[in-house]
Amino acid sequence: GLGLRTSSSLFYLSSMFYLPFIKYFTFQITPVLILGFANLVLIIKIYNDLNSKRYNFITIYNLLVFIFINIFFYRISEHGTDKSAQILILILISEILLMVNFKVIIEKSITKLFVLIGLIIAFKAFYILYGLLFIVIIYHLFQIKKNFSNVLKILIKNYFFLSFIFLIILLLFHNFLITGCLIYPVPISCFDNNLWAIKINEVKDLNNWYEQWAKGGAGPNFRVEDPILYI
């Protein structure tokens, strides 16, 4: 099995719902909370836009996301670590679009982004690649402030930014100690010359399997005949 290679904070959170008598029957509370949170956020956003008659493309986006997650993500038992993180990614995109295209309170908006990106990465370590969206945030801030030192001050003064950086460092260090890779299973981030490191061929095989699964080339009861060609 994969063991601790693909750990997620969702596992630890779900373990809190292992209660006497009820036992593991409340494990699904965690994805219910995530889906409920997303629905609440989207409903509030859509309602505020409609109530103030400020219709724009973000309103349409939020409405489409609301419909999408309730049609395709309604089966709570299938969430795992992927779908809960994907729901938050859709919310994150909405917040980034809002910050980039409209006048908002920068400090408040940045805090939301750091919290969302932090949760996404904590839920699914592989999604640390979405941390690249941080570049978009810095670029937007630089365009507004026109001064790198001012941008740096805004980031450093934000407590969530420091927590975000600590989370990234901790996650990379954890991945390295467990697998020999900074981002598992991304082969280019691996140092397979270490004694404890997973063999690079095994990392590549798992990376291909993830890609095959993500592109619909495999499922619980089927898989394509030629995975490499399919990918």
Which ranges hold each PLM region?
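Short hydrophobic alpha-helices at membrane interfaces in multi-pass membrane enzymes
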Residues: 58-63, 100-119
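Perimembrane helix-loop-helix junctions
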Residues: 130-165
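Membrane-interface transmembrane helices that cradle and orient dolichyl/undecaprenyl
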Residues: 51-52, 89-109
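Membrane-interface alpha helices of multi-pass inner-membrane proteins
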Residues: 73, 110-136, 166, 180
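Multi-pass, polyprenyl lipid-linked donor-dependent membrane glycosyltransferases
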Residues: 30-34, 71-98
